[in-house]
Design a protein with these regions (language model features):
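N-terminal cationic and glycine-rich segments that engage phosphates or anionic surfaces
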Residues: 1-99, 103-431
């Protein structure tokens, strides 16, 4: 492993990409510490200590939302905009045709940026009224109040757009997926709270509750098992054997070898988790923004409170969204008919199946089975911690989501590094 890192550092292009990625991540974390003007961040601490839906947004921003800093909105506007654009791409034929054009993805990315700016503006206005209702503003009336509102909202929007730009820069000049790495950095930066949780368990054990001495190592073992399980399932794949017919080109005989078509168990990666979390958090976040009083509006309070982590309806909706987004992502990423046509053009075939429709039907059936298993895996890892949290009363609802994101992003980044190493005839991270 250490020799691999040394070899990676000897490749100038890879070294520059690594340094650039690290520099962007450092700038991102610095932006998460720059306070927004005219706001008292200490007044917002209690609002984020209640474990409601704002906790999810705070996790995605690396704690910047609770501190009301430049990057308070995090990557959430970009993610929500991506959901909207991708759903519209499937629903609107013009956008679907645009996606198939040579420069279609660049145009869709531009639409994504504009949509992200609109979502960021809406969220900024909502968050402004939240901090105003919490009494965290230094100016709320007169010309000073208007000026403060404009500066605060503009700062939030600018921060969100800067994060989007930073993610795209990592995509172009760095290593790995930019937005995913920013989410990774946000989640890891919040893991310092694990120390507080551990010391809390030890304190309760020392105070006369010895069962927590047993609970702590059990939780550690479960966490390690969960990490191993996620790594194994993320790397698992179904390999379909491909045979290529022999053909003569000039005086040389080409083809005749066997290969395989890899179908990963978790093809969609962590995106279904991220998208489902972002989507299911919208009603609860709106409820937090509106600060609805239970006595004055009991119906609306009950409706928005339904989308809290402690609600079983939230668990069901979250589960269904993960399943739906997993199938949706696989459907737009893999086209069995196109794969079958490519095999036919290259004189390839799957043993036991004729080229054309029989081949595409077999790939479709195999893909559906794998997608179901992958969707159940994602849903189980994401939902089980929430269920355990509801049953035990412990605040571990973000554990499954954050674990999947961190492990998934780490593996994807490792693969990117490995591909660079392999192309330059060095031994990669993955062997």
């Amino acid at each position: 492993m250490f020799q691999t890192f040394r070899n990676a550092w000897k490749i100038p292009e890879l070294k520059n990409r690594l340094l650039f990625t690290l520099a962007i991540l450092v700038v991102y974390r610095l932006g998460c510490a720059i306070p927004v003007p005219f706001v008292s961040g200490s007044a917002l601490t209690q609002m984020f200590a209640n474990g409601d839906m704002l906790s999810y947004l705070n996790m995605m921003s690396g704690g910047a939302l609770a501190r009301c800093t430049l990057f308070a909105l995090g990557v959430t506007p970009y993610i929500n905009a991506s959901i909207i654009v991708q759903l519209l791409t499937v629903a609107i034929p013009a956008l679907e045709n645009l996606a198939k054009e040579a420069d279609g993805q660049q145009k869709l990315q531009q639409i994504n940026r504009y949509a992200g700016a609109v979502v960021a503006l809406i969220m900024s206005i909502g968050y402004y009224f939240v901090i105003r209702n919490m009494g965290a503003l230094k100016h709320i009336s007169g010309a000073a109040g208007v000026f403060a509102a404009v500066v605060i909202i503009a700062t939030f929007v600018a921060g969100a757009q800067l994060i989007t730009w930073a993610g795209e820069q990592i995509d172009d000049k760095g290593i790995g997926n930019g937005i995913s790495l920013l989410i990774f950095a946000s989640i890891v930066s919040n893991w310092s709270s694990l120390y507080t949780s551990v010391t809390g368990l030890l304190t309760r054990a020392a105070a006369g509750e010895p069962q927590f001495y047993i609970l702590l190592p059990v939780l550690v073992i479960l966490a390690l098992v969960a990490v191993v399980f996620v790594v194994v399932m993320t790397n698992a794949e179904r390999r379909i054997t491909i045979q290529y017919a022999k053909r003569v080109v000039g005086r040389k005989q080409m083809g005749g070898q066997n290969s395989y078509l890899p179908l990963k168990l978790n093809m969609s990666g962590v995106m279904p988790i991220i998208f489902a979390s972002a989507l299911v958090s919208i009603p609860g976040t709106i409820g937090s923004f509106l600060q609805i009083d239970q006595t004055a509006h009991p119906v609306w309070y009950a409706f928005f409170h339904t989308f809290n982590y402690t609600s079983w309806l939230y668990v069901v909706i979250y589960l269904l969204l993960i399943l739906a987004f997993n199938y949706f992502y696989v459907a737009i990423q893999y086209n069995p008919v196109e794969i079958a046509n490519n095999l036919r053009r290259n004189n390839g075939s799957i043993p036991g199946f004729r080229p054309g429709k029989p081949t595409s039907d077999f790939i479709t059936r195999t893909l559906n089975k794998i997608t179901l298993i992958g969707a159940i895996f994602l849903a189980a890892v994401a939902v089980l911690p929430i269920i355990l949290g509801n049953l035990t009363g412990m605040s571990i609802q973000l554990g499954g989501t954050s674990l999947l994101i961190v492990v998934g992003v780490a593996l994807d980044t490792t693969r990117s590094l490995d591909s660079f190493m392999t192309m330059r005839n060095h031994k990669g991270f993955l062997g």
